[in-house]
Amino acid sequence: KFPLKIINEKPYIDVLVKSGKSETLAKVLVDNGNSDALWLFANRTNIIEIPSKNIPDFLGRGFSGNIYGKKGRIEYMKLGKYEFKNIITSFPDSVSTQNINNTIDRWGSIGGEVLRRFYQIFDYKNNALYLKPNKNFEQEFLYDKSGLELQHEGMEWVEERIEVRGHYKGEVFDGTGEKITNSFAYKFDLKPIYKIFNVRTSSSAEAAGLKVNDQLISINGKIAYKMSLDQITKLLRGPEDKIIKLEVLRDGKAIPIRFRLRTML
């Protein structure tokens, strides 16, 4: 059970963090909609330091535009009796934090990558948050090792060929009773379009020549529109040196791209 503070109709809790010389208590927004583990606003205090080993990164989109900053691993974050070591933490830059909720003593956000490890009950009436570890609790904190940020760019009609099967052992017959071999039909379905909207500087994706607005056709032999964005994201968070083979559409041409996932943190 954790004390929950409601400020401007938003929930906050206190966590202990160490990113620098000292451990400090930080008030953070509880944000299940944020896919990262932890955000800290280093520019609002001199106690929190950005780790020396970090990468510049696109952190997300807010109401006022894109949010950029850095990612690094801090020594730990403590949530009551639960401790997360070497947790991947995002540090929005000062320009981005100007447009983020300016609660005076807010130091960041705790996001979905931590919260998904718990069963959660929000008791707003009694200002309490109940957390209980679930099956995800011991999972490693992962991050994108490709340098790609993908987004859903709407839908498109796709023609697919399907085999027409008869009722007996796959046999198909025409109107005269003659057997038809290799019978196919075609159907049109609306499928998702995935495009690249950011390529991290000095990443494997940048080195391989991938560009903003490239449309993803396939990844490791799987047609992109048959996958969810979450499934693709998980592939790009795979182990060091995993080979990624993409086919992208650029200016009407299909381009094959191959690179390896690279650990940068």
What are these regions (language model features)?
Residues 1-25, 54-73, 100-103, 233:
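Pepsin-like aspartyl protease folds
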Residues 99-100, 143, 147-149, 159, ...:
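C-terminal, low-ordered peptide segments at domain boundaries
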Residues 77, 111, 148, 205, ...:
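Terminal peptide-recognition signature
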Residues 154-218, 222:
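PDZ/PDZ-like domain segments forming the peptide/carboxylate-binding groove
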Residues 211, 217, 233-265:
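PDZ-domain C-terminal substructure recognizer with occasional recognition of PDZ-binding tails
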